[in-house]
């Protein structure tokens, strides 16, 4: 069941915003870049990689096409991250929560809608975001891949693992199997991602990391996504696991970034890529200077 959520904005303003959103192309735009020998792949990533988590959710509307495009144009991250859910008819869409309530003008479960009904969903940008943002429809995964695939490395999280086969088909059809990390918190799902021939990312919480033995995953995980709140020893164990890339989430401050790099991580997922770009700094020597330990 889908319900309407009352907006705190004046009704006339909401109507104008909705009308403007309907008259804009939203997910149109130029055709894909000429790739030459092929799309941009993970082989192009720098030694230390910055990921715009949910597009950079403290700076742009999360999981929106306009937010992803803004993060792409700003160039403060080398990877753009977004979340995926599956609609009732199997269509993968870009969305984080199980329900529509927090970030749209509607309520109810995402999986309760089909692709036609999805066209009526409108995001509700947070008031405290910098800049001015219009209300727009959340994109489908296909739309993001067609707009940004091959232009920049992407990272998508499978919130609904049942959508893996369809997502895998989209990536193969577009030649993007080396250009998109496919993320999950479940090692069993990560194994399926690997068997599908995709770049496999496995994220872990601080609590999970206390009991993890990440060296067991090194033969089939391409990216281990670790929690910045984890203990130093747990982060070091991840770094020494043999997994090719170890990146830390969700980093917001320069001090958190510096701690992650000092402990050996070679990338960070951040909600504020612009902020971190302004404070590149140096990796501190003793970790205790950053963590207080």
Give the location of each predicted region:
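Phosphate-group recognition and catalysis centered on beta-loop-alpha active-site segments
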Residues: 2-11, 20-293
């Amino acid at each position: 069941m889908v319900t309407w959520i009352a907006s705190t904005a004046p009704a006339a303003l909401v109507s104008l915003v909705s009308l403007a959103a309907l008259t804009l192309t939203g997910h149109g735009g130029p055709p894909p870049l000429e790739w030459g020998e092929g799309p941009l792949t993970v082989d192009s990533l720098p030694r230390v990689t910055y990921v715009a988590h949910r597009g950079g959710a403290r700076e742009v509307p999360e999981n929106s096409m306009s937010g992803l495009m803004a993060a792409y144009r700003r160039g403060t991250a080398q990877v753009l991250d977004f979340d995926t859910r599956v609609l009732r008819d199997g269509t993968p869409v870009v969305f984080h929560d199980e329900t529509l309530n927090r970030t749209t003008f509607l309520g109810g479960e995402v999986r309760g809608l089909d692709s036609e009904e999805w066209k009526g969903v409108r995001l509700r940008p947070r008031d405290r975001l910098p800049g001015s943002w219009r209300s727009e429809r959340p994109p489908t995964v296909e739309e993001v891949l067609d707009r940004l695939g091959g232009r920049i490395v992407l990272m998508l999280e499978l919130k609904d693992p049942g959508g893996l086969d369809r997502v895998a088909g989209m990536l193969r059809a577009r030649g993007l199997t080396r250009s998109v990390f496919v993320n999950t918190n479940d090692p069993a799902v990560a194994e399926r991602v690997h068997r599908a021939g995709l770049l496999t990312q496995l994220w872990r919480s601080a609590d999970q990391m206390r009991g993890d033995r990440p060296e067991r995953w090194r033969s089939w995980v391409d990216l281990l996504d670790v929690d910045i709140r984890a203990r130093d020893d747990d982060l070091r164990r991840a770094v020494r696991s043999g997994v090719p890339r170890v990146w830390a989430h969700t980093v917001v401050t320069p001090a958190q970034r510096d701690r992650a790099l000092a402990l050996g991580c070679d990338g960070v997922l951040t909600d504020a890529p612009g902020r971190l770009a302004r404070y590149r700094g140096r990796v501190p020597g003793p970790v205790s200077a950053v963590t207080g330990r």
